[in-house]
Design a protein with these regions (language model features):
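N-terminal intrinsically disordered/low-complexity leader segments
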Residues: 1-26, 189, 218-257
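Hydrophobic alpha-helical segments that form the core
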Residues: 3-8, 162-187, 196-213, 226-237
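Short hydrophobic clusters on alpha-helical segments that form packing/core surfaces
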Residues: 27, 31-39, 81, 85, ...
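Helix-turn-helix
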Residues: 30, 38-72, 76
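Alpha-helical DNA-contacting segments of helix-turn-helix folds
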Residues: 39, 67, 73-81, 127, ...
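Hydrophobic alpha-helical connector segments
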Residues: 76, 90-118, 166-173, 203
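Short linear capping/connector segments at secondary-structure termini
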Residues: 91, 122-131, 190-191
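Amphipathic alpha-helical packing segments from all-alpha helical-bundle domains
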Residues: 122, 131-157, 167-183, 201-208
Length: 257
């Protein structure tokens, strides 16, 4: 039986090239690192093969020895990113409580956005243009969302929440996470950047909102950083960049990651 998974479809775009030797694999890896660097700097639509070749310090023709086009190279880079993120999520330790069950994966997601804002932006661009990668990305998101949905059902057995309802809740909360992190790290919203200065800050805020939405109570956090700061903002009716509030926030210690 032939492979029909999104990953198999992406691999088939590369065609047959003699790149199995250790030297060839090393050079191929260096080209992928160059693709990643250029994607971070200028994005997919502006990228040219000459940019990648210059970044890698190779001739343009050598790029085509390893990849048929930029689209294939980009898909491999982004697939590696998705695979690495999935592996890190699977390796997270068992959470001590319901809050950590939300906070830890959200922190990992926020750290990925901070480290690779260009690649995260590119995920949307390439998924729009390459059906194989769109399928891979949707598959990854769907698996993650269904895991959240199953967790919701387990935590509320007496509520008799159906699969469709739990999925709807999971997608809504997941979209909130993607939307905020995209605004902070991809669009570089200055107002949000003033308040949510680190991935730990972003993860705490998102986890607190998620926790309150699910359990209708405050999370059991001993030393909240951002949620305490937001409470100050609301009570004082001040903007996020008000010096007094900014000074208060800067003196707080981030939640341990």
């Amino acid at each position: 039986m032939s492979e029909t998974t999104p990953k198999a479809a992406l691999r088939s775009r590369g065609g047959s090239r003699e790149t199995s030797s250790a030297r060839a694999q090393k050079r191929r890896g260096l080209i992928k690192l160059a693709v990643s660097a250029v994607l971070e700097r200028m994005g997919y639509r502006a990228m040219k093969v000459t940019d990648v070749a210059a970044e890698a310090g190779i001739a343009v023709g050598l790029f085509y020895h390893y990849f048929p086009d930029l689209c294939t190279a980009t898909c491999e880079v982004l697939t590696d990113l998705v695979d690495d993120l999935s592996a890190q999520l699977d390796a997270l330790p068992k959470p001590e409580d319901r809050y950590q069950a939300v906070y830890r994966p959200t922190l990992l997601w926020a750290q990925t956005y901070e480290q690779h804002p260009g690649l995260m932006r590119c995920l949307v661009q390439v998924a729009d243009e390459v059906p194989e990668f769109e399928a891979l990305w949707l598959q990854t998101n769907d698996a993650w969302t269904r895991r959240i949905a199953r967790s919701i059902v387990r935590q509320f057995p007496s509520a008799a929440i159906g699969e469709r309802m739990s999925l709807s809740i999971a997608y809504a909360l997941g979209s909130m996470i993607d939307g905020l992190l995209n605004e902070i790290y991809v669009h570089r919203n200055p107002a949000l950047g003033t308040l949510l200065k680190t991935p730990a800050h972003s993860a705490e805020l998102l986890a607190a909102i998620w926790y309150r939405a699910l359990y209708l109570e405050n999370p059991p956090v001993d030393m909240p950083v951002i949620t305490a700061g937001i409470e100050l903002l609301v009570r004082a009716r001040l903007d996020a960049d008000t010096p007094a509030v900014a000074s208060t926030l800067s003196g707080l210690t981030p939640t341990a990651d």
